[in-house]
Amino acid sequence: MSCEAGPTDTQFWANFYTVEITSDECLSEVGSLLNCSSKITVARSLRGNEAQAFVDFLDRRGLRLLSKICKAQRIIPASYVLQGRSIRVRRAHGRGGFADVSNGKYLGCPVAIKRLRMHEGDSDRIFRRLCQEVVVWKHLSHPNILPLLGVSVSTDPHCFRILSEWMPNGNVMQYARSNPEVDRLQLLSEVVTGVAYLHKLKVVHGDLKGANILVDSAGTARIGDFGLMAMAGLSTIFLSETTDSFGGTVYWMSPELLDPQRFGSNGRPTCESDCYALGMVIYEVLTGLRPFHHLNAYPPVFAVLRGERPGKPLDAESLGFSDTLWELVQSYWSESSSARPTPQRLLDYLSDPSLTWVPPLVYPANGIDTNSDVSSSL
């Protein structure tokens, strides 16, 4: 391996900034760098935009490479693994769509413990995906992202547990119901900020909904449950109007996830499908109701594919839905994924200093809140 590098060795540094570089090439270049003192010296001497570009490359491509290796080899970095005997499970707290949830303690601190449910035939594939997703989640660091503390593993993949900080205020819907005076627009601004952070890193959440947005002790919204739907092998669902075996997730799913063949999709969550779900979260938080709440007997799969979307609330303005916000939310529900705005559009609106929150006197109840249960303007 050549160890000649200098400020004029433009090809070496150009490789680091090439978007199209493959994982094998990335590994080769990083190996070349780490095994060559002169190249390390050059790297340390970078300044300004060059230094930023180099750091961004390592951050972005290094994470991608690490996650791919972990998936291929069914391994997790040792620093992520928590000592099992230091974990104390106290009691079952709930049963989500794809995981059993308990609360407990790790080293004396309260934690949430999730055990992903896996079927025997799919356990190897799901475990590999889990290794990949955990690497990405552990890498994330943002005030509106739920921190991953680590994982507890054994030789049995069915015993794989994910540990995160315990959020005492529950999810955003529980918190809003318990605190009717809370500024829901501020909570939504925090959620959108978190999603924008993920998408900037090209990380897709894949299961955005109120139940997966938690609230910490300071009242700050934090997004959690990254990729659990995809990890569970549910990136594509069978069309069914009679079952809801996906933890209610179908109520937030975009058309291209519900019927990939029709929309030319591979059925995997994308930033665009996240944005569709984000629009549903806005509706959910401001109204206090699940999207398509009037469809109590079956999921809204066919309704969504017919172009139907939640109808405008009867008292939209009092709930925080200005005409501008309602039109914006509807744009996130576009049938065409490419027509959906990025989270920045919502951030621009929610960051307006003139925007104020006035709690409504009454929130919708029993699902009777709209002029019409669905709109079909798409």
Task: Name every feature range the model reports, one short phrase each.
Residues 100-120:
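Glycine-rich ATP phosphate-binding loop
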Residues 200-215:
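Catalytic-loop of the protein kinase fold
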Residues 90-96:
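Protein kinase glycine-rich loop
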Residues 46-84:
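Juxta-kinase regulatory segment immediately upstream of eukaryotic protein kinase catalytic domains
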Residues 147-158:
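Short beta-strand micro-motifs within the conserved protein kinase catalytic domain, predominantly
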Residues 216-251:
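Activation segment/activation loop of eukaryotic-type protein kinase catalytic domains
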